[in-house]
C-alpha cells in the first residue's frame, strides 16, 4: 500500500515547508510536493503507511494553511479532470462517478489482505463519502437559495400582482352576497 497522502482544497500560496511542519508530527516524511498548475492540492509521502493513515484520520477536514482541507490516502492512480485531485483516485469523495464493476474488482483484492486494516479503511471511506454527500447537499441548497434570490424585480412583481388580484376578486364576491 502507498504511504502517500493527498491534501486538497489548499490555497494557491501553500508551501511545502508549511505542510511539512503540519504533517511531520505523524511520522518521517519522505517527500512533500505542492501543485502549482493548477494550484490547490499537494501530496505528502511518508516512509510508513501507518503514519499516512494517522495523518488522514487526524487532519481530514481540519484547517491547513488557513483553509479547511481534504486529506485522504492516495491510491496512486491519476484521475481525469484537469489534474485537480489527480493521484487520489476517488478513494473516498468521488465514489459515485466510478463504475461499480471497476470498484469491486479492486476491492476484492484488498479483502484477502489484513482484515483489521481493511475495516478501518472502509470506515474512513464511508465517512468521507458521507462528508462529500453532505457537501453536495449543502451546495444544491445554496444554489436553490441563490436561484430564488436572483429573480428579477419584474418577475417578482408579476407573481405578487396575480395573487393580489385573485384574492381581491374573491373578497369582493364574498362581500356582495347577503348574509
UniProtKB/Swiss-Prot annotation:
- Give this protein's Gene Ontology molecular function annotations: mRNA binding; RNA binding
Give the free-text PTM comment from the record.
Answer: Extensively phosphorylated on serine residues in the RS domain.
Tell me the GO BP annotations in alphabetical order: cell differentiation; gonad development; mRNA cis splicing, via spliceosome; mRNA splicing, via spliceosome; regulation of termination of DNA-templated transcription; RNA splicing
Keyword set for this entry?
Developmental protein, Differentiation, mRNA processing, mRNA splicing, Nucleus, Phosphoprotein, RNA-binding, Sexual differentiation
- The main place the protein resides is nucleus
Q: Does the keyword Membrane apply?
A: no
Stretches of Gly residues bias are at 78-93
Report which superkingdom the organism of origin falls in: Eukaryota
State where the protein is found: Nucleus
| Compositionally biased region (Basic residues) | 161-173
The yes or no answer to whether the keyword Ligase is present is no
Which InterPro entries does the UniProt entry name for this protein?
A: Nucleotide-bd_a/b_plait_sf, RBD_domain_sf, RRM_dom, SRSF
- Tell me which GO cellular component terms the UniProt record holds: nuclear speck; nucleus
- Record's compositionally biased regions (Basic and acidic residues): 94-160
Give the region (Disordered) as residue ranges.
Answer: 75-179
Q: Which family does it belong to?
A: Belongs to the splicing factor SR family.
Instruction: Please explain the role this protein plays, according to its UniProt record.
Output: Plays a functionally redundant role in shifting germ cell sexual differentiation in hermaprodites. Required for the development of somatic gonad structures and for progression from larval stage to adulthood.
Name this polypeptide is given: Probable splicing factor, arginine/serine-rich 6
Q: Which organism is it from?
A: Caenorhabditis elegans
Name the lineage.
Answer: Eukaryota, Metazoa, Ecdysozoa, Nematoda, Chromadorea
Q: Which gene encodes it?
A: rsp-6
Amino acid at each position: 500500500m502507498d504511504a502517500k497522502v493527498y491534501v486538497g482544497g489548499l490555497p494557491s500560496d501553500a508551501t511545502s515547508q508549511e505542510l511539512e511542519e503540519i504533517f511531520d508530527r505523524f511520522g518521517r516524511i519522505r517527500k512533500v510536493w505542492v501543485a502549482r498548475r493548477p494550484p490547490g492540492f499537494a501530496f505528502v509521502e511518508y516512509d510508513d503507511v501507518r503514519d499516512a493513515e494517522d495523518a488522514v484520520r487526524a487532519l481530514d477536514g481540519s484547517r491547513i494553511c488557513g483553509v479547511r482541507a481534504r486529506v485522504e490516502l492516495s491510491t496512486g492512480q491519476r484521475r481525469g479532470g484537469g489534474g485537480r485531485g489527480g493521484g487520489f483516485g476517488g478513494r473516498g469523495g468521488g465514489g459515485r462517478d466510478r463504475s461499480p464493476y471497476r470498484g469491486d474488482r479492486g476491492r476484492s483484492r484488498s479483502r484477502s489482505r489484513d482484515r483489521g486494516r481493511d475495516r478501518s479503511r472502509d470506515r474512513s471511506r464511508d465517512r468521507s463519502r458521507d462528508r462529500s454527500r453532505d457537501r453536495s447537499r449543502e451546495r444544491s441548497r445554496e444554489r436553490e437559495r441563490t436561484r430564488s434570490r436572483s429573480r428579477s424585480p419584474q418577475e417578482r412583481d408579476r407573481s405578487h400582482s396575480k395573487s393580489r388580484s385573485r384574492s381581491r376578486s374573491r373578497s369582493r364576491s364574498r362581500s356582495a352576497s347577503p348574509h
